[in-house]
From Swiss-Prot:
Cofactor(s) needed by this chain: Zn(2+)
Functional description taken from the UniProt entry: Catalyzes the first committed step in the biosynthesis of complex N-glycans. It controls conversion of high mannose to complex N-glycans; the final hydrolytic step in the N-glycan maturation pathway.
Binding site for Zn(2+): 174, 176, 288, 568
The name this protein goes by in its record: Alpha-mannosidase 2
One GO biological process term: retina morphogenesis in camera-type eye
Membrane topology: Single-pass type II membrane protein
Catalytic activity: N(4)-{beta-D-GlcNAc-(1->2)-alpha-D-Man-(1->3)-[alpha-D-Man-(1->3)-[alpha-D-Man-(1->6)]-alpha-D-Man-(1->6)]-beta-D-Man-(1->4)-beta-D-GlcNAc-(1->4)-beta-D-GlcNAc}-L-asparaginyl-[protein] + 2 H2O = 2 alpha-D-mannopyranose + an N(4)-{beta-D-GlcNAc-(1->2)-alpha-D-Man-(1->3)-[alpha-D-Man-(1->6)]-beta-D-Man-(1->4)-beta-D-GlcNAc-(1->4)-beta-D-GlcNAc}-L-asparaginyl-[protein]
Active site per the UniProt annotation: 288 (nucleophile)
Cofactor binding summary note: Binds 1 zinc ion per subunit.
Keyword terms of this UniProt record: Disulfide bond, Glycoprotein, Glycosidase, Golgi apparatus, Hydrolase, Membrane, Metal-binding, Phosphoprotein, Signal-anchor, Transmembrane, Transmembrane helix, Zinc
Upper taxonomic lineage: Eukaryota, Metazoa, Chordata, Craniata, Vertebrata
Classification via PANTHER family: ALPHA-MANNOSIDASE, ALPHA-MANNOSIDASE 2
Length: 1150
């Protein structure tokens, strides 16, 4: 009977899928591309081409639907096996017995139609695919003559007879918000004078132009200037003499920031511009980030930009693009099925953005046209020939010399419109430079423009002036539907500016602050969401103590400090020591102030009678359970003081948009503890020792861990009191390689001289074996009972003995990584408990811990890995964690870009070791036809795969010398640094490896996406400080901010309160930012237990929030700059895969 029922279920499922597949093909067969925003791709010409395209498309659909049927068949079989096996509890650990845990959800959660996107992505050919470009380039670096990294450029004198060369000389000043000086010091010494002189000198002549990028500096100057000067700036913007480019808070790094922070600093800058200047930037300007990410191109496109410019790209790629005239291209996302993400990008062709490298290929000549370097000044030309002031006597010869460079540079492009930037770091701070540059160039312009035989039109311009002229020229010569510019997909990492000098060191430099940055992002997002919803309650109940609080001002300051840290010399770890301290102090202060906002907002939301709300300006009612004592110290758990008489209240916030089963761990002062759920029932608790050091157990603190089930964006209240409880269980310990006895106290601690037999821990999904050093050796996935080699080891990289060595920017190793060697077997501590088990290995420079949670669901399916790294006593070394497996990834691996998308990588033997290191923001993985091994990260670091089956992650680097890129120091201010990871091993199904090798795109699984989100957005436990003020103060037992979980593939990026148009307060609107993630379905699905489903990107917003009415919802551009002309109030949103969409939302508490 049971077997018959299983076949009925299976047969019904197959029947439904076949019928659905036929419907899907009929519905879509006449289309070449999916509906929605990606219909813009170019269509084939001619009837035969169209017919062939349709046949190919139907073949793809048949293959995709066969794949769906295969996946569902596997799922039904797995489901029937689960029924056959009966319910499975946790096997627990031998010493602990068993424990009843939540059963997994049904495994089949993804709508089969949502699986089509990943299989189609990358099917559209590009003109330029960066993975292919790497195959084409020899990377041989021959001497190119005056253009050392290029080639000799020639032209014919009559090439401009029919169309003159149009040159835009673009004055600019690159102002780092911190590098060799702090942000404030640079402003005091340089930047304020640049602005002041800009106003004076641009007003002198309407033909003069200037560009500005960093809004952090502009906002600081705006606060101290008078109204006439403000009006002058507005006038300059209005008449086109001044242009704001990009308009973010900073010019961010593009390798290490998460897309959350990239968007946030863009919004902060654009909101400031809208409020104070009423301008909307059109063009992106990124001349100094050390490599470029397509994520930034996508964000600019969705913010409403038409064009962008980049500079720091590998010199061999610049040469290749110059030879093929592909320096200007439409940058298209790898995953785009059409052309909806195209943005016109200009790549500067030469070594640097300074004046010697921007007029043409010969820096010796171009330097002579940087008039700040005239004899008698502080700067000269390193090529030995100084500039000459322009006079009637030399203007002809000097103009000819400069025009020759312009013409040669123009030969690298496809039009006769040329961009010639004129600037450098902190330029135009003195009025004398304005005079020298402007007056000398004005004489050159005047002469050139007055000589028809020169066939040139030259003027000062801005970046948009250039792009406008470029588009006009292209429109004039466009004769067919084919674009003048190629479509390009891929990224521009890893950057090298010369020789084998790859800038892969900064992916890891100062990792302490990279981790602090990610914590800050999670906290600011939590604060934004809680504050917006608490604000609506406060407005409804007229709670003036909340409404009049400085929370919005504090939140704005935190946004700006986070934005400042995305600067390309901040999060990168490439600033002077004291500048790093300044950044760290800003983050630290904002973390503290965010805790107050989170605590006060959560307290109001969880309070039953809102009118009883009180606020102490000096502290929050609800306090975080961790405290960081200084900007460079690790966060520590506070110890909650318990008593038997009065319970302590613990409020746990789930900042994630799905309901969640996760472990909460807190510290208390008593081992006899009872935790009561919101229903008043005791919950299962693991009481673990708090270790003062390797062998000493604290008598003052105990760790209490329990499983909490919290609704999406939900707050839940637990009561904790000192009491004997049958639901409380002590953890057991085994100490290996222990040469001294540990004090047991109340815990059972077993001492072993050495490990002897293998050390093992397990949970319902995984069993792990460790060697006698406490390092992982192999893993068994209980889903299929197969054992997999999975070895963890640590390595050292040194630095080369050549003249140029590793520094803050560069990674220049002395060869392959060398194994970390301990003189004797390290001390190993094994914890086994009801809620979790772990193995901790104590090496001299790393405390390495692998933990398994004994829970069903998402967090039970991966291994948590934490490393406390301390290399403060080493010299010129970099420490790496390597994970080795038998996966045959064939030199192909994958790293994410900005936590947004996955970029395939290849380990290339023709490149040096350091070139094969890439940025990893949230994950890296390797795979073969059967398995995928993913390392998920809670901080940005460098990652690589130096051999088949391996993933390496760089954890810290200590370098004693400068690497000659301007910093003037090494990196030796190392901190004790906590790195946090998860390792996920997944079984793949229905994989075509040949197709996969050709694909320029890849996607995480849904399980991987959610594991990453859990890692980066942990539960936030908060303790009620003291007791409730009076019996009238009652807390709700639970308050879900959402009515139900969002679809599995939709992430609520932020709910950001929008500023008021007047004053410094808030408006009644918020920015709702949603991201629909692309995911891969080719994984065995048994037991995943996702707490959500997918819905083809459709979501009703009217039913989104719990007890908050949506009064209006209007689509907007990403950074709130633009609203569609036909924007209307919406009740349902429909998101395409991979898209990030912003809406203006107005909420009201009901």
């Amino acid at each position: 009977m049971k077997l018959s029922r299983q076949f009925t279920v299976f047969g019904s499922a197959i029947f439904c899928v076949v019928i659905f597949s036929l419907y899907l093909m009929l519905d879509r067969g006449h289309l070449d591309y999916p509906r929605g925003p990606r219909q813009e791709g170019s269509f084939p010409q001619g009837q035969l081409s169209i017919l062939q395209e349709k046949i190919d498309h139907l073949e793809r659909l048949l293959a995709e639907n066969n794949e769906i049927i295969s996946n569902i068949r596997d799922s039904v079989i797995n489901l029937s096996e689960s029924v056959e096996d009966g319910p499975r509890g946790s096997p627990g650990n031998a010493s602990q017995g068993s424990i009843h845990l939540h059963s997994p959800q049904l495994a089949l959660q993804a709508d089969p139609r949502d699986c089509l996107f990943a299989s189609q992505s990358g099917s559209q050919p590009r003109d330029v695919q960066m993975l292919d470009v790497y195959d084409l380039i020899p990377f041989d670096n021959p001497d190119g003559g005056v253009w050392k990294q290029g080639f000799d450029i020639k032209y014919e004198a009559d090439e401009w007879d029919h169309e003159p060369l149009q040159v835009f000389v673009v004055p600019h000043s690159h102002n780092d918000p911190g590098w060799l000086k702090t942000f404030n010091d640079y402003f005091r010494d340089k930047t304020q004078y640049i602005f002041n002189n800009m106003v004076l000198k641009l007003k002198e002549d309407s033909s003069r132009k200037f560009m500005w990028s960093e809004i952090s500096y502009l906002a600081k100057w705006w606060d101290i200037i008078d109204i006439p000067k403000k009006e002058a700036v507005k006038s300059l913007l209005q008449n086109g003499q001044l242009e704001i480019v990009t308009g973010g808070w900073v010019m961010p790094d593009e390798a290490t920031p998460h897309y959350f922070a990239l968007i946030d600093q863009l919004i902060e800058g654009h909101q400031w511009l809208e409020k104070n200047l009423g301008v909307k930037p059109r063009s992106g300007w990124a001349i100094d980030p050390f490599g470029h990410s397509p994520t930034m191109a996508y964000l600019l496109k969705r913010a409403g930009f038409s064009h962008m410019l980049i500079q720091r790209v590998h010199y061999a790629i610049k040469k290749h693009f110059s030879l093929h005239k592909t320096l200007e291209f439409f940058w298209r996302q790898n995953w785009d099925l059409g052309s909806a993400t195209d943005i016109l990008c200009h790549m500067m062709p030469f070594y640097s953005y300074d004046i010697p490298h921007t007029c043409g290929p010969d820096p010796k000549i171009c330097c002579q046209f940087d008039f700040k370097r005239l004899p008698g000044g502080r700067y000269g030309c390193p090529w030995g020939v100084p500039p000459e002031a322009i006079s009637p006597g030399n203007v002809q010869s000097r103009a000819q010399m400069l025009l020759d460079q312009y013409r040669k540079k123009s030969k690298l492009f496809r039009t006769k419109v040329l961009l010639a930037p004129l600037g450098d770091d902190f330029r135009f701070s003195e009025y004398t430079e304005w005079d020298l540059q402007c007056r000398n160039y004005e004489q050159l312009f005047s002469y050139m423009n007055s000589q028809p035989h020169l066939k040139v039109k030259i003027q000062f311009g801005t970046l948009s002036d250039y792009f406008d002229a470029l588009e006009k020229a292209v429109a004039a010569e466009k004769k067919s539907s084919q674009s003048v510019f190629p479509a390009l997909s891929g990224d521009f990492f890893t950057y090298a500016d010369r020789d084998d000098h790859y800038w892969s060191g900064y992916f890891t430099s100062r990792p302490f602050y990279k981790r602090m940055d990610r914590i800050m992002e999670s906290r600011i997002r939590a604060a934004e969401i809680l504050y917006q919803l608490a604000l609506k309650q406060a407005q409804k109940y007229k709670i003036n103590k909340f409404l009049s609080s400085p929370h919005y001002t504090t939140l704005t300051e935190a946004r700006r400090n986070l934005g400042l840290f995305q600067h390309h010399d901040a999060i990168t770890g490439t600033a002077k020591d004291w500048v790093v301290v300044d950044y760290g102090t800003r983050l630290f202060q904002s973390l503290n102030s965010l805790e107050k906002i989170i605590g006060d907002s959560a307290f109001l939301l969880i309070l039953k009678d809102k009118k009883l709300y009180q606020s102490d300006p000096s502290k929050a009612f609800l306090e975080m359970d961790t405290k960081q004592s200084s900007q460079d110290s690790l966060p520590q758990k506070i110890i909650i003081q318990l008593s038997a008489q009065e319970p302590r209240y613990l409020v746990v916030y789930n900042p994630f948009e799905q309901e969640r089963h996760s472990v909460v761990s807190i510290r208390v002062n008593s081992a006899t503890v009872k935790v009561l759920s919101d229903s008043g029932k005791p919950v299962e608790v693991q009481v673990s020792a708090v270790w003062n050091d390797m062998r000493t157990i604290s008598q003052a603190a105990y760790e209490v861990s329990f499983l909490a089930h919290i609704p999406p964006l939900g707050l839940k209240v637990f009561k904790i009191l000192e009491s004997q409880s049958s639901s409380s269980h002590l953890a057991d310990y085994v100490l290996y390689n222990n040469d001294g006895l540990a004090e047991n106290g109340i815990f059972h601690v077993k001492n072993m001289v050495d490990a002897g037999d293998a050390i093992t821990i397990e949970n319902p999904f995984l069993a792990i074996w460790f060697d006698r050093s406490g390092l992982m050796e192999k893993v068994r996935r209980k889903e299929d009972s197969r054992q997999h080699e999975l070895k963890v080891q640590f390595l050292w990289y040194g630095t080369t003995n050549k003249r140029d060595k590793s520094g803050a920017y560069l990674f220049l190793p002395d060869g392959q990584g060398q194994p970390y060697v301990s003189l004797r077997p390290p001390f190993v501590r094994v914890t086994r408990g009801r809620i979790y088990s772990d193995v901790t290995c104590f090496l001299e420079h790393v405390t390495h811990k692998v933990r398994l949670y004994n829970i069903q669901g998402i967090e039970g399916q991966s291994m948590e890995v934490s490393n406390i790294v301390n290399i403060r006593n080493v010299h010129n070394r970099e420490i790496v964690m390597r994970i080795s497996s038998k996966i045959n990834n064939q030199n192909r691996y994958y790293t994410d870009l900005n936590g947004y998308q996955i970029q395939p990588r290849r380990t290339m033997s023709k490149l040096p070791l350091q070139a094969n290191v890439y940025p990893m923001c949230t994950m890296a993985y390797i795979q073969d036809a059967e398995h995928r091994l993913t390392l998920l990260s809670a901080q940005s670091l460098g990652a690589s795969s130096m051999a088949s089956g391996q993933i390496e992650v760089f954890m810290d680097r200590r370098l004693m010398q400068d690497d000659n890129r301007g910093l003037g120091q090494g990196v030796h201010d190392n901190k004790i640094t906590a790195n946090l990871f998860r390792i996920l091993l997944e079984k793949r199904s229905a994989v075509n490896m040949e197709e996969e090798k050709k694909s320029p795109v890849s996607y995480p699984s849904l399980l991987s996406h959610m594991t990453s989100s859990f890692l980066n957005h942990p539960f936030l436990p908060m303790v009620l400080s003291g007791q409730l003020p009076s019996p009238a103060f009652e807390l709700l037992s639970e308050f879900p901010l959402l009515q139900s979980s969002l679809p599995c593939d939709i992430h609520l990026v932020n709910l950001r309160t929008i500023q008021s148009k007047m004053g410094k307060g808030y408006s009644d609107e918020a920015a709702l930012i949603l991201h629909r993630k692309g995911f891969d379905c080719q994984f065995s699905s048994r037991g995943i237990g996702l707490p959500c489903s997918t819905t083809q990107g459709k979501m009703s917003v009217l039913k989104l929030f719990n007890k908050f009415a949506v009064e209006s919802l209007v689509p907007s551009s990403l950074s709130l700059m633009h609203s569609p002309p036909d924007a209307q109030n919406m009740s349902e949103v429909s998101l395409s895969p991979m898209e990030i969409s912003t809406f203006r939302i107005r909420l009201r508490w009901t």
